Design a protein with these regions (language model features):
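Flexible "cap/lid" loop of the alpha/beta hydrolase fold
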Residues: 107, 111-114, 119-155
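Active-site loop/oxyanion-hole signature of alpha/beta-hydrolase fold enzymes
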Residues: 1, 6-12, 42-100, 281
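Alpha/beta-hydrolase active-site loop signature
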Residues: 25, 51-55, 130, 268-271
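Helix-loop "lid/cap" segments that line or gate small-molecule binding pockets
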Residues: 164-179, 187-192, 203-210
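Catalytic active-site module of serine/aspartate enzymes centered on a nucleophile-bearing elbow/loop
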Residues: 250, 255-343
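Serine-hydrolase catalytic-loop signature spanning alpha/beta hydrolases and amidase-signature enzymes
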Residues: 23-33, 46
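Conserved serine/cysteine hydrolase catalytic core
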Residues: 197-254, 263
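The conserved beta1-alpha1 loop
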Residues: 19-23, 102, 237
Length: 343
């Protein structure tokens, strides 16, 4: 595959490299507001790359990809290769690397950080999805090479990628509908015109789950890294997300207790695009706190409570409503039950 990426910042002067990983159906364009804002700081180099089968990362002409799966494992390997061979080889040996991911990109950031510990110093999760992939192993006939499956999928695919449906899906996940611009819709639809797009779509949804670690194992590994190796973890979630609701952020915060957790409101599933000024301020504050300042309290005190009409709230993880309280009780009860049964 030809891997497309963009970079803003001075490779020679940067002390921290932030690599943004996008969600399903979008690409590098979803992070241009972060690249433009952060790349102007000579201490930071901001990157965004398109995962294979998304954005502008597609097979080269004549490339044989019959056995290639568009899956968490393949994307994990792609990100690791990108960090090692592109980012680190072009930088000084003392730089820090932070992965920042939205939705699918958030889970991918978790997966890479939990399995390639030597190349990451921190992660920032932006409404990271806790689920991706439903099959335990590959089903032989459910492949992108099966022409019957391709023909069967075609009507659904054509409707799924239509302008009307893309707009409808965006209205579900953006709290501020005025942020749904025509250029965003066009950027999402453009990659679906690739001749290989429908096969990548089929492969994406028929490929197995991540094989190395389950989601819970990823969290446990990151928790251990955070507690024992000074690995940095932060969450920056849009509170009005109808898919990855705040409850999921609360769950993650309960596992990784030292994680810094900010909630933005009003903001939906893609805060990086919908409320970029607030996200950029949070990311810059986190980088200052983690790598450029010894005074955490003083850094946080400079972060505004509201930017461009969006509130920025530091959340401690305590349950705030009946749903979060029930979920907290359930987790606590199950944990105690498991502890007593193993004793």
């Amino acid at each position: 595959h030809r891997c497309y990426y963009e970079r803003k910042g001075d490779l020679r002067k940067a002390k921290v490299h932030v690599i943004f990983l996008h969600g399903f159906g979008v690409g590098t364009f979803h992070y241009r507001k972060q690249l433009n804002a952060l790349g102007g700081d000579e201490e930071v180099c901001a990157w965004s790359m398109d995962i294979c089968g998304q954005g502008k990362s597609w097979p080269r002409s004549g490339e044989d990809v019959r056995d290639f799966e568009y899956s968490m494992d393949s994307w994990r390997d792609q990100v690791e290769y990108f960090v090692r061979e592109v980012v680190l080889k072009s930088s000084s040996s003392s730089v820090k690397v932070v992965l920042a991911g939205n939705s699918l990109g958030g889970k991918l950031a978790l997966y890479v950080a939990a399995t390639s510990e030597d190349i990451t110093d921190g992660i920032i999760l932006l409404n990271a999805t806790p689920f991706w992939g439903f099959l335990e192993k590959r089903v032989r006939f459910l492949t992108k090479e099966n022409e019957f499956i391709v023909k069967l999928t075609q009507p659904y695919w054509d409707n799924f990628r239509s302008k009307e449906n893309v707009r409808r899906l965006l209205t579900l996940v953006y709290a501020d509908k005025t942020k749904i611009e025509e250029s965003l819709i066009e950027n999402i639809i453009e990659p679906t015109e690739n001749e290989f797009a429908i096969r990548a779509f089929i492969s994406t949804f028929t490929s197995p789950k991540a094989s190395r670690l389950s989601y819970d194992e990823m969290l446990e590994t990151i928790r251990d890294r955070n507690e024992s190796m000074f690995f940095k973890v932060a969450l920056c979630y849009g509170r009005e997300d109808p898919w990855v609701v705040p409850l999921w952020g609360q769950r993650l915060k309960r596992v990784i207790k030292n994680a810094t957790y900010y909630e933005l409101s009003p903001s939906g599933h893609c805060p990086n695009d919908e409320t970029p000024e607030a996200v950029n301020a949070v990311v810059r504050s986190l980088l200052d706190e983690w790598f450029f300042s010894a005074e955490t309290a003083s850094v946080r005190s400079t972060l505004p409570k509201k930017i461009d009409g969006v509130s920025i709230e530091l959340v401690d993880g305590s349950p705030r409503n009946v749903f979060e309280k029930v979920d907290y009780w359930k987790d606590t009860f199950v944990s105690k039950l498991l502890s007593s049964s193993s004793a």
